[in-house]
């Protein structure tokens, strides 16, 4: 009776979502495809991402208000470049092409795309032409946008007009009669000025969409899906103490109660005193936490390993080994839950394998292909800021919810090169000093992520009258909304001076401290 009721509820929810007019994102492999969906969901409109090769018949059966063609790593003239059925443009549904999507529109309609003599990556200034278009309604004549392209439009197709340009390329085109639009830049990226307004113009003024999506209703759906999928089976979850795994744990607990078993694996690669902080969660949130000290095993497996991808794979494999040993003690454990989020999935690989892999994430790229446990990832379609909002709704305290992210592989990917116990000890002390000073100076919650990287580079120094030859540490602090793009944090010089002085004087093994001032893109937040 209970499960019949749940199935009925899910049927109602699925029927509701099928009847909602959605914005459809056709994914051509861009690292930002899901971010487009995030931006539009943020303004209250249901958005779905599907592979570009989805059959036209399926698309016709969807209730769509508008279609967005994402960017992608390919050139439209490359062999086997992703393409599109021209019938898409005969559905009388507005279409917006972004970057590769715009170039594909130009090619399909008979225009010309060529290789740039000057590629554009990063910030550029855009200028609007004196052409009336709803796409740029209520926008100034010039503003900053984010570019990321190696090809450009050389000749626009017949019946299209140019809406905007930069000093190097045609930045936007449109066919107003057919409601087909193109942008060479990325409005979905937070550092593109007025990007949200451009998307709002497309969604509300051109597609005539209505607000129909809320985070709260989506969370309720996820809880019911967990109940239906897991049933009476048990779920095992690796609890790291980070925001993602804690929110994941409380969501699953809400769905299956005592059938959730949280496992805290001490890998020896954690922040200083991390084990004590995580075990405190047991009492704060009434979680069933099993503690396992596997620090020696992890360190032995990482011996002589320098390649970051190999380190991630080894750690992921050993995590699964630990969990599967636990399941031998309880045959009713059938699922391995992870706090995988959208940005993890995007940076590892696109679901359709069209995107260029940046790096594998421990949650998605570090697990072995064959394992007995089934995977449960209730957060893998949410971005970090959405997860924080879910955490607020679940009653998670500020100090737990706004802790700076910590990667699954831990300090192994903040120690560049081989991992040793000596390096772990050095890095733990250095990161602890940085965190202490951030709290002391009321800066911790002003920064989204702060950590220290230990380089495999030694340099000469002088302490007292003695020559030193020790490691170099790099401080990395960033601010970001969604972790898809990020800017380095401009910290006060006096603060940096204090942190540097403390690390060099208090941490044996470091005699030089640098500050990383690179943004994402082109850099990633973590070094490995």
Swiss-Prot record:
EC class: ligase
Keyword annotations: ATP-binding, Glutamine amidotransferase, GMP biosynthesis, Ligase, Nucleotide-binding, Plasmid, Purine biosynthesis
PROSITE patterns in the record: GATASE_TYPE_1 (PS51273), GMPS_ATP_PPASE (PS51553)
An annotated GO cellular component: cytosol
EC number: 6.3.5.2
Catalytic residues (UniProt): 99 (nucleophile), 186, 188
Residues where ATP binds: 240-246
UniProt cross-references to Pfam families, sorted A to Z: GATase (PF00117), GMP_synt_C (PF00958), NAD_synthase (PF02540)
Source organism, top-level taxon: Bacteria
Domain Glutamine amidotransferase type-1: 22-212
Pathway assigned to this chain's UniProt record: Purine metabolism; GMP biosynthesis; GMP from XMP (L-Gln route): step 1/1
Subunit structure: Homodimer.
Functional description taken from the UniProt entry: Catalyzes the synthesis of GMP from XMP.
Protein name: GMP synthase [glutamine-hydrolyzing]
UniProt source species: Borrelia garinii subsp. bavariensis (strain ATCC BAA-2496 / DSM 23469 / PBi) (Borreliella bavariensis)
């Amino acid at each position: 009776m209970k499960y019949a009721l749940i199935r009925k509820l899910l049927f109602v929810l699925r029927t509701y979502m099928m009847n909602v007019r959605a914005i459809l994102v056709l994914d051509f492999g861009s690292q930002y495809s899901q971010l487009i969906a995030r931006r539009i969901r943020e303004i209250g409109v249901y958005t779905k991402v599907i592979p570009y090769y989805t059959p036209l018949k399926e698309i016709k059966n969807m209730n769509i208000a508008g279609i967005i063609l994402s960017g992608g790593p390919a050139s439209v003239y490359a062999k086997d470049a992703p393409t599109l059925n021209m019938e898409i443009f005969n559905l009388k549904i507005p279409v917006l092409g972004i970057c590769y999507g715009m170039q594909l529109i130009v090619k399909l309609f008979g225009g010309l795309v060529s290789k740039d003599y000057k590629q554009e990556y990063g910030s550029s200034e855009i200028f609007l032409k004196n052409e009336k278009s709803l796409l740029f309604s209520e926008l100034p004549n010039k503003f900053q946008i984010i570019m990321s392209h190696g090809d450009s439009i050389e000749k626009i197709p017949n019946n299209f007009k140019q809406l905007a340009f930069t000093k190097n390329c045609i930045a936007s085109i449109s066919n107003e009669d057919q409601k087909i639009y193109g942008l060479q830049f990325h409005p979905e990226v937070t550092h593109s000025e007025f990007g949200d307004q451009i998307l709002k113009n497309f969604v509300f003024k051109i597609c005539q969409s209505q607000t129909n999506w809320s985070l709260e209703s989506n969370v309720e759906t996820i809880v019911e899906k967990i109940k239906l999928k897991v049933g009476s089976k048990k779920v095992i979850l690796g609890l790291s103490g980070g925001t993602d795994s804690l929110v994941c744990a409380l969501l699953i607990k809400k769905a299956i109660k005592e059938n959730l078993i949280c496992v805290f694996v001490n890998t020896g690669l954690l922040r200083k005193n991390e084990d004590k902080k995580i075990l405190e969660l047991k009492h704060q949130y009434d979680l069933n936490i099993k503690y396992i000290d596997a620090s020696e095993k992890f360190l032995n497996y990482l011996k002589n390993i320098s390649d970051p991808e190999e380190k991630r794979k080894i750690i992921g494999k050993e995590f699964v080994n630990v969990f599967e040993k636990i399941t031998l003690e309880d045959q009713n454990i059938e699922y391995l839950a992870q706090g995988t989020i959208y940005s993890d999935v995007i940076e590892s690989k696109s679901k359709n394998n069209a995107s260029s892999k940046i790096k594998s994430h421990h949650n998605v790229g570090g697990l072995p292909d064959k394992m007995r446990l089934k995977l449960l990832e209730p957060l893998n379609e949410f971005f970090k800021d959405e997860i924080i909002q879910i955490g607020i709704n679940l009653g998670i305290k500020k100090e737990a919810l706004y802790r700076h992210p910590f990667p699954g592989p831990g300090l192994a990917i903040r120690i560049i090169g081989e991992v040793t116990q000596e390096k772990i000890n050095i890095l733990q002390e250095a990161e602890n000093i940085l965190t202490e000073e951030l709290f002391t100076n009321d800066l911790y919650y002003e920064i989204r992520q702060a950590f220290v990287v230990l380089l495999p580079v030694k340099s000469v120094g002088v302490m007292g009258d003695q020559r030193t030859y020790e490691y170099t540490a790099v401080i990395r602090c960033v601010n970001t909304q969604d972790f898809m793009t990020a800017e380095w944090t401009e910290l006060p010089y006096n603060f940096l001076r204090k942190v540097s002085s403390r690390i060099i004087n208090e941490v044996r093994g470091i005699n030089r401290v640098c500050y990383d001032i690179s943004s994402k893109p082109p850099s990633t937040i973590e070094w490995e």
